[in-house]
């Protein structure tokens, strides 16, 4: 009887199974750790990141050079790039997570039954979480910190674009965590860039409890289509800002410019600007964008505002550009804005700029997105800006968690039932 040679997929499955079993063992230890122990370990991990600045930035420079040579887009390169300031921000985010309240063990609800039994619903970790991501070295630190603080083990599979950055960050993190008593297997980096490893993670039902993808549309779509493990994700960030007729012009101009141009490659960036037909200064909204180098694509009424606005194609309204391109439409009031958003939004973040509180309240109530804003830039769609510390991602689904997913979103719960000998009649 002949035996078939092992395939790449078989090898990847064996690799992921080994990582997951080690992660499960480490997670059981982590779940028993007192909150101060986890806090100290993460504080040490943040310090280790700061101490390894030179090594991490050198690794990132190698990734940036490779990315430029391989033709990565400006948006991807922006996500990949680390500077001393960005690295300091990553370390600060880890330290901030260390100081957050530990959700594990929180009593969500408690009730006494007529028969004397006492029921409690208590937060517990999800278990082993797989994070699959592209060109975002900050995710390595953010995900690790959030998982450890919430008692979960993490299996990290970063993109090939950031391979050197991820390894350097992971090395520093694990050293700091180990100094604080957290087993190294609690945060593991998949050691291969073979795509078969992604497939193995997606098929690891019973070994990995949840998958969180962070990356482009094709990655997230593949994860959602192929996973046999629950997925927490968003597919697109087609975010709208509606400037109502009542908006303060100075406020509207500042918010619109920031929402698009602060960082065009983040998932909270505005991709469509909706201008009320009776707003008094539409040119004051588009001119700063054009002057900043943003390409505008508009409908007929938008193009009448400024001749530099190009015609929009039908698919522009459904496009997440992640670069300095913006769709612009003029709408007849709130109802038409709501209809446009309902037709084209991805459920991520949508905003209104308005002085009329009744209009704003209706917008907040009727827009069905994970994050809905009034008089604020959509670039605030971020766990850190929400006071959650780092975030593991932004979820737009209906189940479990929506919006920025931080500590609470990485927990589930169990029921504790305390009796005194009750039997059921």
UniProtKB/Swiss-Prot annotation:
<keyword id="KW-0963">Cytoplasm</keyword>
<dbReference type="GO" id="GO:0004350">
    <property type="term" value="F:glutamate-5-semialdehyde dehydrogenase activity"/>
</dbReference>
<dbReference type="InterPro" id="IPR012134">
    <property type="entry name" value="Glu-5-SA_DH"/>
</dbReference>
<dbReference type="Pfam" id="PF00171">
    <property type="entry name" value="Aldedh"/>
</dbReference>
<protein>
    <recommendedName>
        <fullName>Gamma-glutamyl phosphate reductase</fullName>
        <ecNumber>1.2.1.41</ecNumber>
    </recommendedName>
</protein>
<dbReference type="InterPro" id="IPR016162">
    <property type="entry name" value="Ald_DH_N"/>
</dbReference>
<dbReference type="InterPro" id="IPR015590">
    <property type="entry name" value="Aldehyde_DH_dom"/>
</dbReference>
<dbReference type="GO" id="GO:0055129">
    <property type="term" value="P:L-proline biosynthetic process"/>
</dbReference>
<dbReference type="GO" id="GO:0005737">
    <property type="term" value="C:cytoplasm"/>
</dbReference>
<keyword id="KW-0028">Amino-acid biosynthesis</keyword>
<keyword id="KW-0521">NADP</keyword>
<comment type="function">
    <text>Catalyzes the NADPH-dependent reduction of L-glutamate 5-phosphate into L-glutamate 5-semialdehyde and phosphate. The product spontaneously undergoes cyclization to form 1-pyrroline-5-carboxylate.</text>
</comment>
<comment type="similarity">
    <text>Belongs to the gamma-glutamyl phosphate reductase family.</text>
</comment>
<dbReference type="GO" id="GO:0050661">
    <property type="term" value="F:NADP binding"/>
</dbReference>
<keyword id="KW-0560">Oxidoreductase</keyword>
<dbReference type="InterPro" id="IPR016161">
    <property type="entry name" value="Ald_DH/histidinol_DH"/>
</dbReference>
<keyword id="KW-0641">Proline biosynthesis</keyword>
<comment type="pathway">
    <text>Amino-acid biosynthesis; L-proline biosynthesis; L-glutamate 5-semialdehyde from L-glutamate: step 2/2.</text>
</comment>
<dbReference type="InterPro" id="IPR000965">
    <property type="entry name" value="GPR_dom"/>
</dbReference>
<dbReference type="InterPro" id="IPR016163">
    <property type="entry name" value="Ald_DH_C"/>
</dbReference>
């Amino acid at each position: 009887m002949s035996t078939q040679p092992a395939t790449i997929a078989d090898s990847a499955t064996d690799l992921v199974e080994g990582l997951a079993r080690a992660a499960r063992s480490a997670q059981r230890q982590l779940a028993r750790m007192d909150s101060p122990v986890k806090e100290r370990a993460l504080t040490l991990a943040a310090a280790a990141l700061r101490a390894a600045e030179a090594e991490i930035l050198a690794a990132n420079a190698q990734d940036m050079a490779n990315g430029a040579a391989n033709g990565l887009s400006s948006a991807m390169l922006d996500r990949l790039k680390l500077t001393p300031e960005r690295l300091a921000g990553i370390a600060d985010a880890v330290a901030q997570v260390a100081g957050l309240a530990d959700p594990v063990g929180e009593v969500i609800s408690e009730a006494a039954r007529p028969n004397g039994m006492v029921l409690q619903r208590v937060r517990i970790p999800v278990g082993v979480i797989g994070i699959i991501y592209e060109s975002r070295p900050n995710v390595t630190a953010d995900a690790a910190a959030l998982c450890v603080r919430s008692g979960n083990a993490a299996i990290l599979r970063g993109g090939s674009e950031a391979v050197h950055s991820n390894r350097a960050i992971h090395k520093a993190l694990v050293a700091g965590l180990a100094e604080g008593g957290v087993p190294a297997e609690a945060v593991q980096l998949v050691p291969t860039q073979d795509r078969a490893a992604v497939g193995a993670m997606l098929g690891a039902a019973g070994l990995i409890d949840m998958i969180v993808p962070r990356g482009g549309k094709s990655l997230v779509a593949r994860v959602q289509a192929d996973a046999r493990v629950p997925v927490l994700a968003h597919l697109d960030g087609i975010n709208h800002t509606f400037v109502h007729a009542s908006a303060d012009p100075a406020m509207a101009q500042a918010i619109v410019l920031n929402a698009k141009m602060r960082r065009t490659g983040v998932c909270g960036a505005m991709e469509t600007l909706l201008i009320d037909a009776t707003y008094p200064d539409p040119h004051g909204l588009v001119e700063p964008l054009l002057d900043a180098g943003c390409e505008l694509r508009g409908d007929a009424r938008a193009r009448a505002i400024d001749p530099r606005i190009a015609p929009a194609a039908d698919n522009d309204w459904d496009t997440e550009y992640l670069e300095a391109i913006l769709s612009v439409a003029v709408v007849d009031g709130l109802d038409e804005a709501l209809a446009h958003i309902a037709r084209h939004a991805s459920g991520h973040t949508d905003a209104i700029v308005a002085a009329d509180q009744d209009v704003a309240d209706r917008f907040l109530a009727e827009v069905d997105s994970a994050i809905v804003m009034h008089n604020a830039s959509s670039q605030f769609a971020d766990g850190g800006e929400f006071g959650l510390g780092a975030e593991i991602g932004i979820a737009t689904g209906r189940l479990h968690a929506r919006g920025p997913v931080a500590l609470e979103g990485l927990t589930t719960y169990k029921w504790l039932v305390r009796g005194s000998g009750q039997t059921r009649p």
